[in-house]
From Swiss-Prot:
One of its GO terms (cellular component) is cytoplasm. This is Elongation factor G. Catalyzes the GTP-dependent ribosomal translocation step during translation elongation. During this step, the ribosome changes from the pre-translocational (PRE) to the post-translocational (POST) state as the newly formed A-site-bound peptidyl-tRNA and P-site-bound deacylated tRNA move to the P and E sites, respectively. Catalyzes the coordinated movement of the two tRNA molecules, the mRNA and conformational changes in the ribosome. The keyword Transmembrane does not apply. Pfam families: EF-G_D2, EFG_C, EFG_III, EFG_IV, GTP_EFTU. It comes from Wolinella succinogenes (strain ATCC 29543 / DSM 1740 / CCUG 13145 / JCM 31913 / LMG 7466 / NCTC 11488 / FDC 602W) (Vibrio succinogenes).
Length: 693
């Protein structure tokens, strides 16, 4: 079966936005106008087809990225819905990996909000070309031009409007298309399905001319031939302007900018046209890099084409009540039929693909074969996890691995009834497979099950999903912070482990130097043994001993981070030495050295941004100071005060409730992990005493 739509007519896009900028509504409208969903779903009443998990319906925020396919003017658009909440940035990063372009949705009133900055940085990191849709133009306080200047000031990007609004707030009627120089006015009877093309209103002609000139200049700058023509005073054709804007958009030099009101069904078609005109096809983005699975030092670049052996990346795992486990895969090269085998090069295992499903919001369609540039769900994979590469055994390649952040918050969970113990274990493991930023382990001392994640909301949703999807009700303990330990000075230490009591003895003797590393460097082991004073085969055992010992530090038993150990001397015994003996010697030497190396306790410090009306500013700052916060900056954002601070996570529990009562529900905040910082002496002492209990 040959492919129906050529590769250059495919667009893989993500729609990324801050909460409440209207992202899900925008996606919904796209599905409506491209003929997928017949009744327009509203987030307000929880019926949107994209938000298909129950909790999302209740909370009205999008949690998991579902991939949906729709068609517009002979083009296939695959939309990956990305969550807009800070606790889910992992989901956003993951979808950024497999996108070719993104539409950033901003609210015309709120503009660029903290989460939008985070998402923007992630899109920069993965080199995703993007365009902007300014939504909610019908709201009170809507201002398209404000958002334009915020994008250049805050995001340091260059927005180029290709349409400008006609009216704003309740007089918002449509847009002026700066390419055709016509006004597109939507009529409300057809639910926005049709618009009338009219002459530009007299009071907007001057503004339209000014913005058209800016747009043409931006387009001309992207290409030498166009620049020459422009400087010679010749008119650029519509096609030439589009070409210039497309080149600039792909190079991330400019950001095409549009506006509308998804809720009021205005401006969505022009957005779809722009997606096709400016965002790249899979063939127009840089080749993805990978390494040879047989020899990881050898780089391979994988070109988007149907030719060549199959290669794809698993970017999302979901459990579907009817089909079982779905593995969402982006195909980069080649094609694959359902029922065939794929090779998971990350794990080194072969798996059979039972079915291939194309997802349309919440409906699914079985397909026989999938081609390069496509995104679809594989059914039947048992071993594959997020970030694994699937390819053909003939040409095994490992595509770039995704990096996942370490969790910063943990809570103990136990099932309400003993009978649910096993069910809870199964449920948590399934959820951990879906979400790499969520971990499950059991506390050896207390035997409790501990779950860890990226924030309170993240863990709340996990507990909620256990109840809904797996029917397990859980009791939740107090949140615990992921403390760490580190050392502040360098120490040399000798340790001899010798046991001589009948039978074979044990003998391991090491000299190590323990020294601090800069924050975030992690653990480094240096082998500086010369002349064979310790045989080669025992050296990894010393490293292993240190790795085991660093899991539980000398102060309060927290993992030790950011240090370097150099093994520089030692001795061995022909008969009694063994790997075991050197492992024990390594771990004892490390523990002894750590006690003398000025150990300190570290805690996660969060970057917190609070938005409050001016009247409450003093109270909120006072409260942040009481929470050991360090205020970094204060500013204004469209009439609201914005406070940026670093605050220890340990002090932030229950903050949302406190902020609500302090500001009568008018304050909002976001927080994300920033770095680990040293715990002050008096507090550190309390924590250590409590741990040793």
């Amino acid at each position: 079966m040959a492919r129906k739509i050529p590769l250059n007519r495919i667009r893989n896009i993500g729609i990324a936005a801050h909460i409440d900028a209207g992202k899900t509504t925008t996606t919904e409208r796209i599905l409506f106008y491209t003929g997928v969903s017949h009744k327009v779903g509203e987030v307000h009443d929880g019926a949107a087809t994209m938000d298909w998990m129950e909790q999302e319906k209740e909370r009205g925020i999008t949690i998991t990225s579902a991939a949906t396919t729709c068609f517009w003017k002979d083009y296939q658009v695959n939309i990956i819905d990305t969550p807009g909440h800070v606790d889910f940035t992992i989901e956003v990063e993951r979808s950024m990996r497999v996108l070719d372009g993104a539409v950033a949705v901003f609210c015309s009133v709120g503009g660029v909000q903290p989460q939008s900055e985070t998402v923007w940085r992630q899109a920069n990191k993965y080199g995703v070309p993007r365009m902007v849709f300014v939504n909610k133009m019908d709201r009170i306080g809507a201002n398209f031009y404000n958002v334009e200047s915020q994008i250049s000031d805050r995001l340091k990007a260059r927005p180029v409007p290709v349409v400008i609004p006609v009216g704003a707030e309740d007089t918002f009627k449509g847009v002026i298309d700066l390419l055709q120089m016509k006004a597109l006015i939507w009529n409300d009877e057809t639910m926005g399905a049709k618009y009338d093309i009219e002459e530009i209103p007299a009071d907007l002609v001057e503004k339209a001319n000014e913005y058209r000139e800016k747009m043409i200049e931006a387009a001309a700058e992207q290409d030498e031939a166009l620049m020459e023509k422009y400087l010679n005073g010749e008119e650029l054709t519509t096609e030439e302007i589009k070409r210039g804007l497309k080149i600039g958009c792909h190079a991330m030099a400019i950001i095409p900018m549009l506006c509308g009101s998804s809720f009021k069904n205005k401006g969505v078609q022009t957005l779809l046209d722009a997606v096709i005109d400016y965002l790249p096809a899979p063939t127009e983005v840089a080749d993805i890099h990978g390494v040879d699975a047989k020899d990881e030092t050898k780089e391979i670049s994988v070109q988007s084409s149907d030719e060549g052996e199959f290669a794809g990346l698993a970017f999302k795992i979901m459990t579907d009540p009817f089909v079982g486990q779905l593995t969402f895969v982006r195909v980069y090269r080649g094609s694959l039929e359902s029922g065939s085998y794929v090779y998971n090069s990350t794990k080194g295992k072969k798996e059979r693909v039972g079915r291939l499903l194309k997802m349309h919001a919440n409906k699914r369609e079985d397909i026989k074969e999938i081609y390069a540039g496509e995104i679809c769900a594989f059914v039947g994979l048992k071993e594959t996890l997020t970030g694994d590469t699937l390819c053909s055994e003939k040409e095994p390649v490992i595509l770039e691995r995704m990096e996942f952040p370490e969790p910063v918050i943990s809570i103990a969970v136990e099932p309400k009834t003993k009978a649910d113990q096993e069910k809870m274990g199964i449920a948590l493991n399934k959820l951990a497979e879906e979400d790499p930023s969520f971990r499950v382990n059991s506390d050896e001392e207390t035997g409790q099950t501990i779950i860890s994640g990226m924030g309170e909301l993240h863990l709340e949703i996990i507990v909620d999903r256990m109840k809904r999807e797996f029917k397990v009700e859980a009791e939740v303990g107090q949140p615990q912070v992921a403390f760490r330990e580190t050392v502040r000075k360098a120490v040399n230490k000798e340790c001899k482990y010798a046991k001589q009591s009948g039978g074979r003895g044990q003998y391991g003797h090491v000299f190590i130097k323990l020294e601090p590393q800069e924050a975030g460097k992690g653990y480094e082991f240096v082998n500086d043994i010369s002349g064979g004073v310790i045989p080669k085969e025992y050296i990894p055992a010393v490293d292993k001993g240190i790795k085991e010992a660093m899991q539980s530090g000398v102060l309060a038993g927290y993992p030790v981070v950011d240090f370097k150990v150099t093994l520089y001397d030692g001795s061995y015994h022909d008969v009694d030495s063994s790997e075991m003996a050197f492992k024990i010697a390594g771990s004892m030497a490390f523990k002894d050295a750590a006690r003398e190396a000025s150990p300190v306790l570290l805690e996660p410090i969060m970057k917190v941004e609070v938005e409050v009306p001016e009247d409450y500013m003093g109270d909120v700052i006072g409260d942040l100071n009481r929470r050991r916060g360090q205020i970094n900056s204060m500013g204004d954002r469209s009439g609201i005060k914005v406070i940026n601070a670093f605050v220890p996570l340990a002090e932030m529990f229950g903050y949302s409730t406190d902020l609500r009562s302090a500001t009568q529900g008018r304050g909002t905040y976001t927080m994300e992990f920033s770095h680990y910082g040293e715990v002050p002496g008096n507090i550190s002492k309390e924590i250590i005493e409590k741990r040793k209990g």
